[in-house]
Amino acid sequence: MSANDIALKVAADAGRAAQELVLGLMSMPWGQVSPSVYETGRLVTLAPWLTGHGERVRWLIDTQRSDGGWGAPEGYGLVPSLSATEALLSVLRRGDDTGVGAETLREAAARGLRLLSRCLSGAGLSLPDMPAIELIVPSLVMLINEHLEENGMSVPLTLPVGMSAAPLEAVRAWVASEAEIPQKLLHALEIAGDAANGAAVAHVTDIGTIGASPAASAAWLGDRGPSEPGHPVRWHLEAIVRRHGGPVPVGLPITVFERGWVLSWLARAGIPFEVPPEMLADLRAAIGPAGTPAGAGLPPDADTTSVALYALALLGVPRRPDSLWAFETPTHFCTWQGEEGSSVSVNAHVLDAFGQYAAVRPAEAARYAPAIGKLRGWLLERQREDGSWDDRWHASPYYATVSCSLALHEFGGPAAVPAVRAAVEWVLDTQSEDGSWGRWTGTAEETAYALQLLLFAGGEERVRDAAARGYAYLLRVADVAEGPPLWHDKDLYRPLAVVRAAVLAAIHLAQSRSLGVRPISQV
């Protein structure tokens, strides 16, 4: 069966594919996440005793770009390139037996250093807004410069213009003092250096993770890793490295996050599927008075909480969204208290949660009307001149734009109509010749977002023509598991089931609008 045959079969039975996807969430409850260069590099340095060390080193070699860097274009490549280069230098310094020749390691590290030197010495480097980047970059630059000094190299790497090591030094002193630190910092505990080893500020979760991060967990376990093979954190790390044969994701588990997004994408599109009762029960139980985290080891956040609430309301088991008040500020809703910056996608999802609950519980709608009005106004103020939105939790403006546009289309009222129309026009104007959409190149994920916006909010012939071209592109991309990571964490990542759900939602919407789809009986 050809790739196109597979794609057509999936398109013709999106409902069955959605059902299989939902059931698959139960069999992999920690979530399905792509491996991360940054996180894998940290395990190479911090945990050479962990199963799969050689495989991790080989994976770093194999994923190096032709220019010597790692990761996505633009400033997104800095953190993974720093991590991978430092990891290879650590392997060379220790003389690890990894199955990769020393000359191969030296050449890869040298290419990484040359790229980093060029990148960091230039004034035009623009860094993305990603968690802990202001701590991660200085910590890795310090480690690399220690390697260079040991090797007698007199030209150290510099920090990007405008970045200082002072915040990192303050956090390290904070961790060493054993004073309580914000839970979100535990996700990047590895930046604390020696102070992370056994840090009293960290608490091991029931599943053995520190901060839902393999790197943070390995840093905390420290020198106990090889001597205590039965330690819960060691067991947790061993379980994670087996998922990808050595490399590791940047964050795990993402149980609530994954389930909320998958269920809401599918339900919003109207795909018929059944949810295991225990999954709905778990999702309801996860939402406490202060909200819910994406997974064990993370702090509660408004994004995961609102999407879970929205999914529950769509699926007929609404829960009062009062836990979201914990994230309200005078102007908008924060991802978590103390957030530096703000997120349009988070506020769009909060609007979804309030709006959908008010729709299914109209007797309580007045309670949430002021917040809905505030959210609408805040989102409208942040639309860019071209009609799009951008966001701190995703590299693609198509994700931010579909999040804001759909929330405003459903719950923003007449005042939001011009903004949604402008977003539709932006999507129409940015379609590629092959029918796809994408920030750097066309992807199934971003095309699915664009299609959903067009099919929910558009209607005229020009919209139908563009949507038909986008749908045809999706049919040609049979394996949606392939594609670049676009979601923001310490490194870019790809939540596979979430992306799959978004694509299935777009396919189903295209089918329901009869965009040139053959009847199921003919496929």
What residues fall within each predicted segment?
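A short helix->beta-strand "capping" segment at the edge of beta-propeller domains
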Residues: 13-25, 199-202
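A short, surface-exposed, charged and often Trp/Pro-enriched helix-loop connector in the C-terminal portion
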Residues: 107-108, 473, 520
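Edge strands and adjacent loops of beta-rich recognition modules
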Residues: 187-201
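Helix-turn-helix repeat elements of alpha-solenoid scaffolds
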Residues: 14-19, 192-195, 327
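Buried hydrophobic core positions in alpha-solenoid tandem helical repeats
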Residues: 21-22, 60, 112, 116, ...
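Nucleic acid-processing catalytic cores of prokaryotic defense/repair systems
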Residues: 65-70
